[in-house]
Amino acid sequence: MVSRTGLVEAARGQRPLDLVIRGGLLLNVYTGEVYPADIGIYGDRIAIVDRDRRLGLQGRNEFQARGHIAVPGFIDTHVHIESTMVTPPHFARAVLPFGTTTVVIDPHEIGNVYGRAGIEYMLKASEGLPLRVYLTIPSSVPAVPGLETAGAVFEASDIAEMLTWPRVIGVAELMDYPGIIQQTPRMAAIAEAGLRAGKRLEGHAPLVGGRDLAAYLAAGV
């Protein structure tokens, strides 16, 4: 992690950049433009983007990007790493070369099999990777109470505790949307635990509309 002062000085040209990505094009996702630009890196941060290469950036190292387009890292906002049948480190190796730099995972599959220990494993196995991994805590463990044999049951109190863990940003897809709409005690408590913690509630309500959709949204999803 670089200091803020160092980053400012690098942007102003008062200290050398660590890396200059030179000769490529840049996709501006705000304006839709593609234009020539050199990119100056200091530490692990972008210090400066030199549109049209007017500033003649210099750095300790250079990467020649001619023929390439620089784009922001892709963010996959919902993924089940377990479905890929690989561990988080192997998943990172697979997706990083194609531009995905951040994922938000819902580990409800391993949670339904292995319970809290499964969520802890996913948290630890994704720590320190070059891929940024954020977690949401499964709201449906078991997925269909009374219809299946799951490895655990996550009540609101369990979810509330796991929401305090690092890199946890929300409650995963609230698949029991009838329970949310009807405000059953268990699902209402799970939603309230997420809201009380200041976290996002992720929706999952296929084909729901009208008053039911309005009620689902009114519940905080």
Model-based region annotation:
Residues 2-72:
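Histidine-rich, glycine-flanked metal-binding segment
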Residues 7-10, 89-198:
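Divalent-metal coordination cores built from histidine and acidic residues
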Residues 24, 44, 67, 78, ...:
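Divalent metal-coordination and catalytic microenvironments
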Residues 55, 207-211:
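Short acidic loop-to-helix transition motifs that present clustered carboxylates
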Residues 68-91:
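Di-metal (Zn2+ and/or Mg2+/Mn2+) metal-binding site signature of metallo-dependent hydrolases
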Residues 69, 74, 194-203:
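Short beta-strand/loop segments at the ligand-binding rim of alpha/beta enzyme cores
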Residues 158, 211-212:
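Short acidic active-site motifs
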Residues 214-221:
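Short, intrinsically disordered, charge-balanced linker/junction segments flanking boundaries
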